[in-house]
Amino acid sequence: MSEHNPYGTMHGTTIITVRKGGMVVMAGDGQVSLGQTVMKGNARKVRRIGKGEVIAGFAGATADAFTLLERLEKKLEQYPGQLMRAAVELAKDWRTDKYLRNLEAMMLVADKTVTLAITGNGDVLEPEHGTIAIGSGGNYALAAALALMDTEKSAEEVARKAMKIAADICVYTNENVLVETLESAN
């Protein structure tokens, strides 16, 4: 049981970002589980923020993730067009603020130039190959996507196939996948 949630740990999601062929794609499943129960199958965990120039996806406690998304949007207003700077400033706040420190979530964010994972430990990580995944099925999705990167598949096809594979393996991930895309500068 989580110290913040008397019903047990909230599980369930897989979020992946794939950067390939001039596109950046973020995909996430719709399942929200509480303990061993599926609470919702069509949650929207991937969305556009920052005037539509940034895509963001989250894993973890939903209310916590929304709090962090709101904070990131404020940082993007403060540092327009500077996703890396906004993410680092959010991570600093997350790590040092007494209230934020207790939030249980992780985020992937991407714009036309950079993809980042932001964690509650204050980490801002840029993936080595432009592909990264988080959540309960994240490792399965990441392995599948990396295996598909040298194929003729588009970034969206790679992301969708990786999500399908993760959903086949991870009980906390479903096949109700939402995808957001942006043109990539690299």
UniProtKB/Swiss-Prot annotation:
Its EC top class is: hydrolase
Q: Which UniProt keywords apply?
A: Allosteric enzyme, Cytoplasm, Hydrolase, Metal-binding, Protease, Sodium, Stress response, Threonine protease
Q: Which reaction is the catalytic activity of this chain?
A: ATP-dependent cleavage of peptide bonds with broad specificity
InterPro entries in alphabetical order: ATP-dep_Prtase_HsIV_su, Ntn_hydrolases_N, Proteasome_sua/b, Proteasome_suB-type
Catalytic residues (UniProt): T13
Q: Where in the cell is it found?
A: Cytoplasm
Q: Indicate which residues the UniProt annotation says bind Na(+).
A: A167, C170, T173
**Which cysteines share a disulfide bond?**
none
PROSITE patterns on file: PROTEASOME_BETA_2 (PS51476)
Q: What does this protein do?
A: Protease subunit of a proteasome-like degradation complex believed to be a general protein degrading machinery.
- Give the UniProt family note: Belongs to the peptidase T1B family. HslV subfamily.
Name of the protein in question: ATP-dependent protease subunit HslV
Q: Please name the source species.
A: Allorhizobium ampelinum (strain ATCC BAA-846 / DSM 112012 / S4) (Agrobacterium vitis (strain S4))
Q: Which gene encodes it?
A: hslV
